[in-house]
Structures are given as structure tokens and as C-alpha cells.
């Protein structure tokens, strides 16, 4: 056996040992389907998710939706927190901040990007 081949085999066996020592990770991708707060964003067409709008979106309904989303994330994660949670259809950072507050024991941080959606869904 040549020396380079021996080095390659040793490195491969060391790498495989590290692979087996890894902990499993939970990654969640979740379409929360229109997570809007109940305050108007002047730059967006979010009128249907206001108390007087088509969906009669109230503070109570917003809080209930946040509670349910948080419960789903906890149920999926089990005893360990998910390593990454990706959410779709979230209106703004306020919604993410409110959700992270409900999940504060997991110490989640968030990254938010504004989309070009007229309604404000990101």
C-alpha cells in the first residue's frame, strides 16, 4: 500500500468516526399561512388582516395563532429545540419577536427579509 493511500484511509476512518459521533438535528420548515399582527403597515396592503377587515383579525386571534404555532414547534422538537426553524408567510419582525417570546426557553434568534409581496407576507 502506498503512503498517500494509507494517509487517505486513516483520514477517512477518522472522519467517519466523527460522523457517527454527531447528534441528530431537527430542522423545521413551516408555512404558518398568513401570520399577520393586527396593526396596519402603511407600506403594505394588509387591510384584510385588521379588526375591521375581511378576516376580522383581532389581537386575540393573533395571540391564539402565535400560541398554536409555538405549540406545533415545541411538539415537533420534543425535549430538544429544533436547530433551525424556517417560517413562510410571516408579515413582519414583530410577529417573529412575539413568537420567539413564546419559545424563549429555546433561545431562538431570528433573521427576517422583506419580500416584494404587496400584502406584506415574507
Where are these regions (language model features)?
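N-terminal, active-site-proximal structural segment of metallo-dependent hydrolase catalytic domains
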Residues: 20-121
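Bacterial Sec-dependent N-terminal signal peptides
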Residues: 1-23
